[in-house]
Structures are given as C-alpha cells and as structure tokens.
Amino acid sequence: MFATELTGKTVMTEDGQILGVLSDFMVETKTGKIQSILVDPAETVERRLFKTDPEGRLILSFRSMKAVRDVIVTQLAD
C-alpha cells in the first residue's frame, strides 16, 4: 500500500475512538522513513491530550499503527 492510498482514511484507536482523518506524514529526511502520521482531529478529540503540529493536527507515531484496511487502527500510549 502506498502512502497516498492512506491519506484521507479515518484513524481510530483500538477501542474504537475516532481520532480523525490522516492528512500527511512526517518523514526522516536522511533515511526516508516515515516517523509520524499527521491526523486532522475529529471534533470530539481533546487536542490538549496529544502532541500537535502548528496547524493543530495530531502527531502520532507511525510505529503505533496496528492495522490498515478501511480505517487505520492505532495504539495510544498509556
């Protein structure tokens, strides 16, 4: 699956909480590896609980992604 196919997919937690929609990626320039995903948050998400970029998008670790199908499932740190 290509990164462009992931953009626009809904991102949710393992317990079904919708976090928002994947809008972009943060890439390590030296290695080209995806470090983080940027998520346009759903209205119900408390942004203060997450690390955000200057545009208010949630910054989630790429490694936290658990499954990708119709939606992207991510694991939140405890």
Q: What does each of the following model-derived ranges do?
A:
Residues M1-D78:
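Peripheral interaction segments used for macromolecular assembly
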